[in-house]
Amino acid sequence: MTGRLAKRYARAVLGLAREDGTLEATGEELNRAAATFDEPRLRPLVLSPVIDAAARLRTAAGVADALGLSPTVRNLIALLAERNRLAILPDLARWYDSLLDDELGRARVAIRSATTLSAAERNELIELARRLTGRQKILSATEVDAELLGGVVLDIGGTVYDGSLRTQLARLTKEMAEGGS
């Protein structure tokens, strides 16, 4: 239920941001606010049904002030606080990013590799992501993960393409164990 609810709020906020011409900035603000409310100090406020609405609203306003949030995001946070729905903020931010990516015709790809990639290797993987998604605009994030042993893992919109040596070795080990019994 919270996924659907978060998506509905995200659609509404996207519409407001579109009208204001603040699509990207609103997404950044939502992600900052979601990360802030997910901090251990504020998490009890988000999850506790015993905290009254006035206290949640005061805290939400304080966070909005500290983060310098726009009126659109500030009002959203106040509404979520009033309705004791601040817990959906991380999902709402993810939905917003996803809807915004769709609207702007772009895709996100997370690239994990065992070693640092050269510019040519990175560009080749981005080109692969373009072919797989059919989108020309690709937002990429790279990460080195030595535990992969070799190869790369691509996460494109939640679909994982695992070409790591670690996974290949695990698959081979499993096949050998099953074949040997």
Could you say what each language-model-derived stretch is?
Residues 1-181:
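Elongated, mostly alpha-helical coiled-coil "stalk/stator" tethers of large membrane protein machines
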